[in-house]
Every structure is written in structure tokens, then in C-alpha cells.
Amino acid sequence: MPRTHAIEDYRNFGIMAHIDAGKTTTTERILYYTGKSHKIGEVHDGAATMDWMTQEQERGITITSAATTAFWSGKRLNIIDTPGHVDFTIEVERSLRVLDGAVCVLDGNQGVEPQTETVWRQADKYNVPRIVFVNKMDKTGADFYRCVEMIIDRVAGNPVCCQLPIGSENNFKGIIDLVRMKAVVWEDEALGAKFHDEEIPADLADKAAEYRNKLVEAAVELDDDAMAAYLDGQEPDEATLKRLIRLAVVGRKFNPVFCGSAFKNKGVQPLLDAVVDYLPSPIDRGAIKGIDFKTEEETVRKPSDEEPLSVLAFKIMDDPFVGTITFCRIYSGVMEAGMGLLNSTRDKRERVGRMLLMHANNREDIKEAYAGDIVALAGLKEVRTGDTLCDPAKAVILEKMEFPEPVIEIAIEPKSKADQEKLGIALSKLAAEDPSFRVSTDHESGQTILKGMGELHLDIKVDILKRTYKVDANIGAPQVAYRETLTKKTEVDYTHKKQTGGTGQFARVKFTVEPNEAGKGFEFESAIIGGAVPKEYIPGVQKGLESVLGAGVIAGFPVVDVKVTLTDGAFHEVDSSALAFEIASRAGFREALQKGGSVLLEPIMKVEVVTPEDYTGSVIGDLNSRRGQIQGQDMRGNANVVNAMVPLANMFGYVNTLRSFSQGRATFTMQFDHYEQVPSNVAQEVQAKYA
């Protein structure tokens, strides 16, 4: 099937916002007015089209960004709905990576909220052009002008109004279009489908003229001819003004602001017009950078069907009907069902099975997809989020996505053997779908450890395990991975002798045990000369030493960074064996750990807190109370960044503490940095708990 829309007519955009700002409702209205939904789904009653997982419909929040295709004014819209909760930031990050533009939805009452700040910063990171929609103008306390001020104060944005509201709260009737200088009023009884132009109300004429001037002045600055004409007293016409606003959005010079009430069906059609008029097409965003698979030199792929195929996999989902679905953005070339691809990130071959166009959780099979398309592929074997798929003959690796390290972990134990099998399958699927969710096995306890971005993140994973995969399991409290090591060099001479009639056991070992460099782990070497311990018994010595590493003498934690040198020993022609030397070295090593001043080590995390300036003092005070060491602070935009080293043991519950004292406006990232000796008073508490 040939291309239905030129690539210039594509708008790949996301809808981003804080939780509860009305993002999903806005998307629902867009789908309704573009003819994709026959009935309007409401978040309140759990019927929203885009929120299709049970967990989303119950909690009224969007967890997975569903992709959908719609059409408006002859343009093709690929819309990605993103979650607004801080624990699902990863979903937002990967959506922004593949979008060309975004609509930032604000709650007319709350304005720029904490997650709006986080998402805005992420959009800055990926240079995503955006327009702003001030939603919920019908809500008590809605204040359009305060929201505009907050865009400047909180996210250092550059808002320019393209619309003003007519009335607010219960009296919100419509908008003033500052480009056309007309009032647009909606008729209540027609579900927002009917609206008409009127003259601007007399009481708003002055305000409209003032904001129209601000808009025109901001726009003409981008074009010398328009500026010259304006200075000569000539206002730009509607087409010129729209062209200049588009230039401003694509070049990220300013953020046009629109308003309405998605719930009351007002303002959605002009917002769709703004998406079409102002947000960039793939052509506006230009070529994407990558690395040539063979030469490893930088290369680019232009947004064109004529270029070699390059595709980025940005989301993987397990679909109950189709199996594994991989959401992809095609940056260049044409993809056909059945064609062979190279996963250049992993150097693995793949074949395109079914190609699907997604509408929330409905799907339509297609045979071909083109540059600019966002499609879902079924049946790919080894693709992970962030992988590049491409033409094997002209292979390229596109820029990789970056994923934050998980900051919280819990242990999970299946209740039965059947649950154990189901758990293994379920966890491998969940980990493939979500790169910020990690699964590992604790070798000391044998427990399965789940790691995620926050408590809600892990709650929802556990909920999916129980409901979708029917796994019955016990969930443990979060734990810290302590370690043990030596502080001084010591020497041990140990003899193992056992006589029980017949062949006995005999082995003597003499070794030095000393601290190794941090991070070097365990090292063993033999300095035996002259056969005091025969060669065939030395592996037995090493095996005995290694068997002690799993559990130290303080509280049974793994032993790290120790060097053992075998210096001497003795054997018996008949009674010695590899097993006897293994037993001797095991007992001797434990003795050395007792004598060598064993200490506890704890993981130290590198913590970065991004906070509005008002809360900096509270952040620093709180980190100090957690045995943290402040490394420094600097400014980022209009936010303060505090860097610190803090023991992991003191970081549990931090996400909730930080959220509460900063009203959720501060965010933090945390990653492992190094192990450090535990202070003696804390070591005694740990010993009492675990020994």
C-alpha cells in the first residue's frame, strides 16, 4: 500500500503532564473528535480508551504509554499518552526520545506541578519542541494567568499566549483566538462538537489587544522582513503569524499557550489545529545521528523513504493475544512485513512478523510502514528497549537511550513450586518490557530480588504478577547488601588431622592473608617451592578458601577484597587428599578472618537531589541526618542541585520523605558508588540484627 500522507504531514507528538492534570481525558477527546472513538471514555469510571491495563483503570492513572494514530485537517497524528507519576518517569523518557513534539497539559488550578517540572526537564534534554494547554479552566480556582507565570518561574520556559479564556470556573464559555482575533464559543448540548465564532466581548477587548501585541512582537523577532514591516506599522497577516509561531516552536524560541476544558469538551479542536499548525514534522526535526555498524564512525539518517531503513525500538509489551509487541519509530526507509532486519545493538538477525497500527489496545494489520511512522511489531525474538533495527546491508546504531538505575529493592518468595515456575516466566517478561525494573538472585539467601524506581513502581509490578500471571508470593522488606573484609595482614599455620582406622585425613597449610585493593575482590596465589604441597592438592586449597567467601565471621555477609598467599604446608603419602587440604584451608581461613580484624562494609550511594531553592536547606539537613556527606551544590536552570554520598541503609523511604517536605517538587536520582567501612556503633546494630 503506497504512502497515504507525505512525511511533512506527520505529527508525532506526546501528551505530557503531572498526574491528574487531565492528560488522558485530553487524549480521549482528541480521539473522539478525530473520529477514532465512538464514545467518550472517562477516567473517573475507568473506561478511558488509552488506559487499558486493569491496574490503570482502577487507579485512574496511566502507566504504559499507549500509541495511537488519528487524522486531523489532512494530517496524520501519531499520539503517545505518557504517565505523569514520578515512579513511571522511564515511560516518559522513552516516549520523548521518539517524539517530534509535545503538548504539555497543565491543571488550570494547580499550574506547573512537580512532575511537570521533571517531564519538562526531560523534554529539554531531548530538545523536544512543545506547546502548552492549560486544562480544567472550568474548575474552581482555575487561573490561566497564574499558570502562565508559573511556566516562567518553575521551569524557566518562555510562554506566549495564543489564546485567552472567556470566563473561568462555572462561567468558562470559550476562548479568544489571538491569531484570528475572534472569540470561539462552544454550545453545551452538542458534546463540544459544535462551536462558533463571535466578536471578542467588549470587557475583554483591551486584554485581548495587549496579549495580541505580545504575541506579534515575540513572533516578528524571528524574521527580519516581518520585523521591518511591523515597525512600519504593518501587522502580519494570519498566514504569516502562523508561519512565525511555527518557526518559534520548532526552534524552541517560545512556548505557545492554549486553554480549555477537555472534560467539558471545550478547546480541544483549536488545540488539534495548533498541533497541526505549530508542532514539527519529522522533516523539521531533521536527520538522526548514529554510528556506522562497520566503520564505527558517526553517520546520519535523513527522514526519507529513500534512505536505508533505520528503526528504534522504544517500548516492549506483552500482549495477551499477540504475544510480545515491540513499539518502533521508523526514522528512515520503508519496512515491509516479512522482511529481514539486523538488530545492530546486539548483532542479531530478526524477521518482521506482523506489523500493527495500534489504537490504545485495538490493532490493525498493515503490510508496509514508512519513515515517520510509529508501529508495533509482533514476533521479534531478542529485541530490548532502546535497540536499533536496520537494513543489514547498510547497518547503523542509533543513539542509545539512557535509563536510570533502580533505587529500591524488595525480596519475593513464591509460595509453591508451581508459583516458582510461573514467577520465572513472568519476571523475564516484565524485565524485558521495562528497563527500569531489574530482577536478580541473591546468592547468599537464594531469594529473588526485584528492583525498581519507587514504591508505587514495585507495587504495580507485584500486582501484575499476582493478577495477570496468577503468581502467589510473599513480599519481603527492603534489604541492604553488606560485605565483610580484613583490616590487617595475618599469618595462619593450620593442620587438619583425622584418624578413624584405615585411611585417615592429613593436611597442613600455611598462608598469609592480607587486605586487597578496594574492588579487586578475592585473589589466591601459591608460593610453594619444592613440593611441600603437591600440585594436585592446590586446587583443593583454593576451593576451601573460596567456600568461606560466601559468609564472613562478623554477621555472615560475603567477604571481599582479600588476598591469600599459600607459603608452606605438609602432606602424608597415604592420608592426604584434595578433600583434606580443602578442609584445612577452610578452617585456617576462618581463623585468619577472626585474627585479621574483620570489619563490615556498606554500600554508599551517589545521590543527586534537584530541588527548588526554597527547599535546599531542608534537603541538606535531611541528608546530613542520614549520615550523608554533601559533596557540593550548583544551579540547573532555576533549580538547585545537591550532590551527596549517603549510605544505602539510610535511604529507605527517602522518596516519600523528599516528596512530602518539598510538596513533591524535588526529585532525586541515586546510584551505587562504592563500599565503605561501617562506623562501629552502626556495625554493632547490624551484627545484633543478622549474626
Curated annotation (Swiss-Prot):
Keyword Glycosyltransferase: no
tr-type G domain boundaries: 8-283
Compartments, record wording: Cytoplasm
Binding positions (GTP): 17-24, 81-85, 135-138
A GO MF term: guanosine tetraphosphate binding
Pfam family, one: EFG_IV
Record keywords, A-Z: Cytoplasm, Elongation factor, GTP-binding, Nucleotide-binding, Protein biosynthesis
Chief place of localization: cytoplasm
Cited SMART domains: EFG_C, EFG_IV
GO BP: ribosome disassembly
Entry GO terms, CC: cytoplasm
UniProt cross-references to InterPro entries, sorted A to Z: EFG_II (IPR041095), EFG_III (IPR009022), EFG_III/V (IPR035647), EFG_IV (IPR047872), EFG_V (IPR035649), EFG_V-like (IPR000640), EFTu-like_2 (IPR004161), G_TR_CS (IPR031157)
Purpose of the protein: Catalyzes the GTP-dependent ribosomal translocation step during translation elongation. During this step, the ribosome changes from the pre-translocational (PRE) to the post-translocational (POST) state as the newly formed A-site-bound peptidyl-tRNA and P-site-bound deacylated tRNA move to the P and E sites, respectively. Catalyzes the coordinated movement of the two tRNA molecules, the mRNA and conformational changes in the ribosome.
NCBIfam families: EF-G (TIGR00484), PRK12740.1-3 (NF009379), PRK12740.1-5 (NF009381), small_GTP (TIGR00231)
Family affiliation: Belongs to the TRAFAC class translation factor GTPase superfamily. Classic translation factor GTPase family. EF-G/EF-2 subfamily.
Name recorded for this polypeptide: Elongation factor G
Taxonomic source organism: Azorhizobium caulinodans (strain ATCC 43989 / DSM 5975 / JCM 20966 / LMG 6465 / NBRC 14845 / NCIMB 13405 / ORS 571)
Gene: fusA
